[in-house]
Structures are given as C-alpha cells and as structure tokens.
Amino acid sequence: MTEEKKFSGSNRPARKQAVPERKELPASQRRHAAKLADGTTPAQGGSRPSRPARPNNNNQNRPNNGGQSQNRNNQNRSNTSTGGQNRSNNGGNRNNRPGSRVAPAEGRPMIREKKNWSTKPREGQVDYSAKPDNSLKQYVNENEKKRQASAAAKHPKKPAAATKPAVKKETSATKPATASTTTGAGKFGGALASGNNSARNNSRKRNTNGTGQQTPRRNDRPRGSKKSRRIAAKHQPSTPATVRKEQPLPAVLEYRVGMNVQDLSKLLHRDTAEIIKKLFLLGIVTNQNQSLDEDTIEILAADYGIEAQAKEEEDVADIDRFFDDENIDESKLVSRPPVVTIMGHVDHGKTTLLDYLRNSHVTEGEAGGITQHIGAYQTRINDKLITFLDTPGHAAFTEMRARGANVTDLTILVVAADDGVMPQTIEAINHAKAAGTPIIVAVNKIDKPGANPDDVMNQLMAYDLVPEEYGGDTIFVKISAKFGQNVDELLEMILLQAEVLELKANPNMPARGSVIEARLDKGRGPVSTVLVQQGTMHVGDPIVVGNTYGRVRTMTNERGVELSEALPATPIQITGLNGVPQAGDRFIVMADEKTARAAGEERAKRAQEAVRNSGSVVTLDTLFNTMAEKAMKTVPVIVKADVQGSVEALSGSLKKIEVDGVRVDIIHTAVGAINESDVTLAEASGAIIIGFNVRPTPLAKSQSDSEKVDIRFYNVIYNAIDDVEAAMKGQLEPVYEEKVIGKVEVKELFKFSKVGTIAGAMVEEGKITKDSKVRVIRDNVVVFDGEVGSLQRGKDAVNEVKMGFEFGFTVAKFNDVHAGDVVEAYVMEEVKPK
C-alpha cells in the first residue's frame, strides 16, 4: 500500500505530483553526474562541503551514487526542504511547472522536463476544484438567493419562488482516494492518470453565469454558427402560411368573343397560369394577352365542367347611352351646386360681374378687353357653392354659348342699361330658351349717366321676358357690376331659383360630364376644362372624352390647386389625354384603361369614316377637282389657334363671310403651333394660314418663306375677319397672274459716287425689260421685290436685254445687290375669265 497524504487545511486531497517519464541521459551528462557524485568537481575546489544531490525523479528505484540511498519511488509528496518553499504541484512555483527549465541543484544536471498539460483554470475563470466539496453548492445557493431577492424587489406582491434543497450527490471529487487514484499509473501518473480524473472533471464544471442554471453542453447546443441560426430564424415564418381558399367556379361562364386568358381568369376565379396550362394540355398554345375564339372558350368551359354562354356584344363606342336619365338611381341622389351661365352682348359687363364675384381680374389679361374663350369658376356664397360659366358675348362665339347653355341650370342675361337689347342679346335669349333653362335678367351699368333700366325691361318683354312686377315670371335685378351694387341680391335670387329647381346628382357613380374648353399646352400636353355633371372623378380614372381617351393624370381647379377628387357641378382642368378633344364633347369614366382605349379608338375611327362619307373632307385630289369645276369662287384658309374654342369661333365667323358669291373654304383647323404639315397643305392648295395667338415653328417658318406661303397672325378676331373680307373683295376685281419672263445672274459690281452701285449681269434665260418687275433672290430666299431702276448696255440706256448678252442695271429703292444674286424678271398679266 502506498502512503496516503494528509489533508492540509481543507477537505480537498492533495494533488499528486506528476512524475515525468524516465529519460536516458547523454554520455557527457552521465560523466558529469558521476563526477558530481564523487565530489571532485572543479567548481568546488575542495573548499566547500559537498551538498547532498537533489533527488532525480527520472531515476526511479535507483540508488544515488552520492552516498544517499533514499528510495525514489513515484509517490507524490511535498518537499519540506529548507527555505519553506512548497515544491509540490499544488504550489505556485513557476519553476516547478511541467515543461519549465528547472534550475539544477548541486550535483544534478539541468534537465528539461517533458511538457505536461496544466489543469489550472485560465485567468478570470473560477477554479471550483480548489474549493471544498460543498463550495459549488454554496455558490449556487448564494446566486439563487440574490435572484430571489431581485425578483421580490421588482414584484413585491408576488411571493418569491421557494428554493428547492439541493440534492447532494457524491462526485468523484468527494470520494476518498483509492489505490487507483493515488498510485502513479499511466503516462502522466498521479491523479491525472487515474480512471476517474477527478481533478480534471472538477476543473471543467460548467459555468452558471450567475443564473444558477448551467449552460448547455456542446452536444446539447443547436448546430450551426450564430449567424446561420440567426438567418434561419429570420426567414422562418412565425406563423404557418395560410392556404388561400379557392373560389368556386361560376355556374355559367358568360363570355364575349375575343376575350383573352386574363379576362377569363377573372370570370373563372383561377390563375392565368392554370388556364394556360389547361389549354396547353388540350392542344392549344396561347398566352394571357392573346384573344380566344368562341370554340376555344367553350372547350375550356367544358373542361372545367361548366356551361358557356356568349353575351351580346356591347357597343363600347356608344357612350351617349350612359347619359340617359334611366341609368341614374334616384334613391342615391343628393343636392348639388347650381351651374350658372352668364350671357350677353359685347362689353355689357359679363366678365366684370364674374370678376367681382370671384375677386379676380380677367378682363385686364384678355386681348382687346374681350373674353376669348369660356371660363369656368366656382365660388362660395353663404356657405353654398355656385359654379359660373363665362361665355363670350360676341356673335362669333355662338356655338360656345350654345354649349354653355346645354350644361347650365340657370342663365344670367346681362344687358347694359345704357345700350339696351342688341343682336347678341337676342341670340343669347334664343339659346337659353332652346336649352330650357330659366333666365334671370341682370340690368347692368345703372350707375352710368343716361342709364334707363325701365326701357330695357320694356324691350325684353317683346321676347317673352316679362318681369314679375309686371305680372310675369322673369326675375329682373338692377345691378352695377363695377361697384358691386345689388350683386348680393342677384346671388340670393340664384340660390332661391336653385332651391326651386331641386338640383340633385349621384356622387357614388363613375363620373360623366361635358368638355367646356380644350387646348394643347407645350409642357403638359392636352389640357381640357371639363364640368362634372354626375358621379365623382378621381385622379387615375380611365376616361373617354369625345374621340380620344386617356387616364386622368392631374386635376386642378380655377386657382391652380391640385385636387384628388371632383364632385358633381365642379369645373376642373385635367391632363393625361392622348389628344385634344372638341369643346362640347361628352366624357365618361370607364371601368379600366383597356376599355377606355377601345372606346376612344373606335369613336375616332367612326368619326373619320363619317367625314369621309360626307364628302366634306378636303384632300389634294378633291381640292384640285373642286377648283377645276369652278362651281364657285373660294378662298382656302387654314385656321390654327391656341384653344379649341377660338378655333371654332374663328372658323364659324369666316364661313359666314360671303361677298358676291365668293366664300371662305376652311380646309383645315387644329390647336397648336403652325407646323410643317400645315405649310405643305397650304402650298399645295394655295391657302392662307391664319394663326390666332400662335406662332410657327422654326422649320415651318423657313418652309413658308421658301414656298411663299402667306401666314397672318392675329390676337383679336375682329382684325382677322376684316382682313379676310377685304381680301375677298379684292378677289372680285380683275385677276392678274404673275409671269416670269427672264432670269439674270449678277457677275460683278461697279460702284459710282453719283449713281451708286451698278450690277453687271448676264441674261441666263428669257429677257429683262425696263418696265418689268424684279425679285432679288439670295440663297433661295427673296431679299427684295421691286422694279428696275435703270438698264444699260455699255454707256447706252436700253429698254430690253435678251438672253446671252451682258448689261448693267440698278434696282429701284434697293442698293444691296451682291455678286452671285439671282434676279427674276416678271410681269403681271390680267387673266381673262373663261
């Protein structure tokens, strides 16, 4: 039996010293050790007594030749040598660690021990193996008490959880040392070589991190790195995915011929991919946008086990059917603001009245002080909205006034007290009566000297407008729009009349209404002023307007404020159309953009066919045939303007002009700048281009100069009408035709102080005469058109120079002839009627 070590100050058994493996010394070290054993080393010099040799653990069970025959077995015992140093492995002596260089004692060589793995804990790690057996339990209990105290402080009402008594289990550290644990066995010997490895197991106890619960072992932890586990947890759904419930198939598939897979998927409540796959299995290859015929749709329905029934084809281009009163649900009608149209003669104060109502200044910005196109405005009076339509009073705007009367609920007839009833006043009365709208007469300018409102009332009685004070039913209000006199009374009458009419609309339906004005804006494209009559319009609605279509991109009111929706009786400006509609066209919001596109394209196609069939369209062939027939004298004119209302007004006025059988033929009208196509058409037909508030593009201007196309610009319609009428009167006079008689090229210039510059030239074609007119052309551009000043050959003045001769000449009132200029000589000959 080996000797057991006593416990020193603790219940922990002393750690056994690791005995290194025996190692054979080299020959030189063996000889040196033998000399040390004999005590005859040179270092001693015989003066110092020999020190006992240090025990060599490598030499197990071998006697020391130095005279000390102690038995050096492998038992682990503490060193009690002088100096009080604890040389056992339990101490902290650095030189006693395995693998360190041990300072040799006298009589022993320096030997590097074989490296042994240390079981000491790392820095900052708790070494539970150095504590008593119950230290771990005590440490855990202390942490449990701290946790309970912290929980009680946070939740005072909740009693702390009772601590379960720790069950004492016998571990390898508390077992008494046995022979197997005390004897040196194995490679390392001592406790490290024992089967239980109690010291090693105690040093590897898992940390509790202060929670009283041990961290899981490596085999118990989830596999994968922290990053991979975090990514997996992120993509793992927290809740199981819900399976979408498939809607049942319809009992009967009502289809239209030409529907595609995408349309059928909405009717069948199935995905397009499923339908395409089913058709492919049936031997039909298609995609979701390809139209299907009747047989294919019926085969698909039969495969699904349902019946198929073709619906009657609807005329998508017929949008007028939506404006029937039968399509309006009366149970959903609500009150709406009245739409009031202001009519009257020129300068009777219509715009001034509206300007006073909405506190703006439109009159100052209008050309000539006359309203050129319809303006739609909405104002609030006594917490009630009133929509006003301002129609110009000139006779040229008859059609615009008629459109205003068709969309209006009330008509305000403005008559000047100092001017009385005028032709346009009578025209306004007729339009209002034709539309069936009530008329309220506003006798304006009562503040002017010489105003006679009673005379105006008497004049209007001849047109069935009898005042209430005379026993009639027409409301008369005497006002002064300039100073606002009695304007409030006029507004009260408007609201009173609106209550009598019981104006209602359904805001919960697709919007529909009429176009008040349309124009082409350079930055925003087609801009249309529309009046919503039924429903509510939203931004993004697919819309059909006249013969065009689009999607509402923006909506703004009269002040330029963007709106998200527009209720009934609201005038707005919209953008997003593909073309410029006609003023007075109807619009309607469709279910989707595809339907709107189909309806707009079909309406445009039908409109072109109607014009072609009527024979009124003007092409190059029909134009030349008409001119050749000489049925009547015509003046071809092309009209371009900034807005559609001005185009129609100017065209209508020009068509009414007729002087002794000569009339104006409007061959083309459009909105926007004058372009190259207009110039080409004018050059081919010999037409005059009239631009109203527009200018030509640079290319069109260059083309018109080279092709001698006459372009006239106006900003007041009066001037355009007067000029055309004067030209038509000149047309009735004898007709002269230009005839080019010669062509001359300038070769050289001669300058004289008294005469000026004389051009030396040669006649290339024809001849030039003293009485002929000349046209100076430079780089295909006419720089001057005038008469011949002088004509000489040598020093003699001549009246004529023929082809092939050189001569000198001057141009009257023009002294800027250059070498290389081409001069055309022509005369004006009267054309005799046939």
From Swiss-Prot:
This is Translation initiation factor IF-2. Residues 344-351 are annotated as: G1. Residues 45-101, 149-165, 173-201 have a biased composition (Low complexity). Gene3D superfamilies: P-loop containing nucleotide triphosphate hydrolases (3.40.50.300), Translation factors (2.40.30.10), Translation initiation factor IF- 2, domain 3 (3.40.50.10050). One of its GO terms (cellular component) is cytosol. InterPro entries: EF-G-like_DII, IF2_II, IF2_N, P-loop_NTPase, Small_GTP-bd, T_Tr_GTP-bd_dom, TF_IF2_bacterial-like, TIF_IF2. Residues 224-233 have a biased composition (Basic residues). The keyword Nuclease does not apply. Residues 390-393 are annotated as: G3. Its main location: cytoplasm. One of its GO terms (molecular function) is translation initiation factor activity. PANTHER family: TR-TYPE G DOMAIN-CONTAINING PROTEIN (PTHR43381:SF5), TRANSLATION INITIATION FACTOR IF-2-RELATED (PTHR43381). Residues 369-373 are annotated as: G2. The keyword Aminoacyl-tRNA synthetase does not apply. Pfam families: EF-G_D2, GTP_EFTU, IF-2, IF2_N. Residues 109-125 have a biased composition (Basic and acidic residues). It is found in: Cytoplasm. One of the essential components for the initiation of protein synthesis. Protects formylmethionyl-tRNA from spontaneous hydrolysis and promotes its binding to the 30S ribosomal subunits. Also involved in the hydrolysis of GTP during the formation of the 70S ribosomal complex. The lineage of its organism: Bacteria, Bacillati, Bacillota, Bacilli, Lactobacillales. Belongs to the TRAFAC class translation factor GTPase superfamily. Classic translation factor GTPase family. IF-2 subfamily.
